[in-house]
């Protein structure tokens, strides 16, 4: 209100309308973001958050998540710690960049989110080609793991590059349950 007091009357309408327009646009943008964009842990009707600690993860102490996600991450964490895989670098694919943070695993390529559109195929391919020893753990989502098991050509060029990398590194799937597939080099 105070900013409107000192505006001269002949210019007052323009200044007031611009301020109202900017504030209005901000509210509309915030509302639309809340309606159309949600975090993956948004709760379906009837579900509740539960407190969890995931094996092999110090960053999730006192974390709250859904029951299903707790089971998925708990099973994955158990497998990774049992096989001492959290000490290795990781390549993630399938919109799961947080796995690197949750299990404190260093990314094997330039990013933890290789499937993000702004991360280019050329950069991913260059990083994969540079890996010749000390092959990383590869973790993908259920859907991507099933697609990789199909031995087909892939529409997604980045996924095709990862499939070729898995073949070159003689990778085997050691874990395929509860939402994730984990591949390790033999």
Locations of the language-model features?
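Membrane-embedded alpha-helical segments of integral membrane proteins
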Residues: 1-5
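Membrane-interfacial entry segments at the cytosolic side of transmembrane helices
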Residues: 7-25
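Extracytoplasmic
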Residues: 24-185
């Amino acid at each position: 209100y105070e900013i409107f007091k000192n505006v001269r009357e002949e210019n007052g309408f323009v200044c007031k309308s611009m301020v109202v327009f900017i504030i209005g646009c901000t509210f509309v943008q915030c509302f639309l973001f809340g309606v159309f964009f949600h975090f993956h842990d948004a709760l379906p009707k009837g579900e509740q958050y539960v407190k969890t600690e995931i094996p092999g993860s110090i960053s999730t102490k006192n974390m709250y998540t859904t029951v299903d996600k707790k089971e998925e991450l708990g099973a994955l964490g158990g497998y990774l710690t049992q096989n001492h895989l959290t000490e290795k670098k990781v390549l993630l694919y399938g919109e799961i960049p947080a796995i690197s943070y949750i299990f404190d695993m260093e990314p094997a390529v330039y990013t933890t989110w290789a499937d993000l559109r702004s991360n280019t195929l050329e950069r991913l391919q260059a990083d994969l080609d540079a890996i010749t020893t000390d092959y990383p753990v590869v973790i993908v989502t259920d859907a991507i793991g099933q697609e990789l098991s199909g031995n087909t050509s892939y529409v997604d060029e980045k996924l095709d590059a990862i499939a070729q990398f898995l073949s070159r590194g003689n990778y085997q799937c050691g874990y395929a349950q509860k939402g994730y597939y984990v591949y390790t080099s033999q």
